[in-house]
Amino acid sequence: MTQMDEAKKGVITDEMKAVAEAENVTPEFVRRGVASGKIAIPSNLNREEVAAVGIGAGLRTKVNATIGTSTDIVDFDMEEEKARIAIENRADTLMELSVGGDLDEIRRRILDLSPIPVGSVPVYQAAIETIREKGASIYMDEDVMFRAIEKQAKDGIDFMAIHCSVNRETLRRLKRQGREGGLVSRGGAFVSAWMVENGLENPLYENFDYILEIAKEHDFVLSMANAMRAGAIADSTDRAQVQELIVLGELIDRAREAGVQTIVEGPGHIPLNEIKANVILQKKLCRGAPFYMLGPIVTDIGAGYDHIVSSIGAAASAAAGADFICYVTPAEHLALPYPDDVKEGVIATRIGAYVGDMVKGIHNGEKDLEMANARKKLNWEAQFDAAMCPAEARRIRDERPPEDPDTCTMCGEYCAVKIVNEWLDSADTRIFD
């Protein structure tokens, strides 16, 4: 029985109880959300211990960190370090997206070390192994695609991005639409090229019921991949993207009937003024399924600082109702991220998600009040504790110690807070009577 099957029967699972406790909501609230498809809990039956993470309506916006090798840089130890850094800095999930080296080994190593849910994109493995064997991904056998899904499910992958919404109609719309930035989804590119070269429908779309059988057997979450997402602001919310979203909504109906949990991937590159419309459109067409925004990137010119660009997009997306954000690092569009990039990406995205959650009422700024009180009292330890990244806050202060330990080197003896605190404590306050 899957989490969704149990929820539909009225059963509250241990995972639902754990999510409820972490989110400060009732177990029944979580059960209803899972039953309706508005909350997903990635937890493969083949993993003995994985944190119960709830994604969806009424819950804290979650942050995903992607890791993985490239063809140019294959360093499994570094990828493990990146995973550990993401976990230490409180990413909620990981995605292992390697395309270089032994793909089975690196995936299993990450699964072994990660206490949080791990996702993947199985068509990467199918395409890469075909390229190694036959020279090009267009020679993929359909069976190779499904074997990759089944293998990764047996390994314990908790959620998989499946490119099942690329079909002939979405490709026709993409062709007619034309784009400034082209198609930027790697999985979408593999599938689209295969379809065009072979003159056939996408097997992942055509055999979606088979994918549902595999997902139901192992109870992993289908992350409905957005292959038609824009890779440039100029292409945002175009006909190809909307056409794909319509297909995704129809596939989600079938997944829910089968008792399979889903989340829906979204943009991408999108200007701030279109984020709310995209969230409304996705929630309407996909009947409230959890929305997984990739970044989003709200301007194309932030190279080297795209984690900041994404943090802005994450805040706006979470505020508008998005449920899950994939981080972006400073290396985005430039290079494979290093461990330090991963840390920066996780923290920046967590800040954006936190800001958005304040808008949608997930929290009332309790941590902000804690920080405000600590600052007023010049209590530096309490300030560190309240910070999003205590270690970084402490590092900066320790590197530049002030002469007066109550203050910082920005204001020193002219610290406004200290001056006012001392004045109010010592001055004649009859003026306020």
Swiss-Prot record:
It is an enzyme of class 4 (lyase). The keyword Coiled coil does not apply. Binds 1 [4Fe-4S] cluster per subunit. The cluster is coordinated with 3 cysteines and an exchangeable S-adenosyl-L-methionine. GO terms for biological process: thiamine biosynthetic process; thiamine diphosphate biosynthetic process. Keywords: 4Fe-4S, Iron, Iron-sulfur, Lyase, Metal-binding, S-adenosyl-L-methionine, Thiamine biosynthesis, Zinc. It comes from the Archaea. It catalyses: 5-amino-1-(5-phospho-beta-D-ribosyl)imidazole + S-adenosyl-L-methionine = 4-amino-2-methyl-5-(phosphooxymethyl)pyrimidine + CO + 5'-deoxyadenosine + formate + L-methionine + 3 H(+). InterPro entries: RibuloseP-bd_barrel, ThiC, ThiC/Bza_core_dom, ThiC/BzaA/B. The keyword Zinc applies. This is Phosphomethylpyrimidine synthase 1.
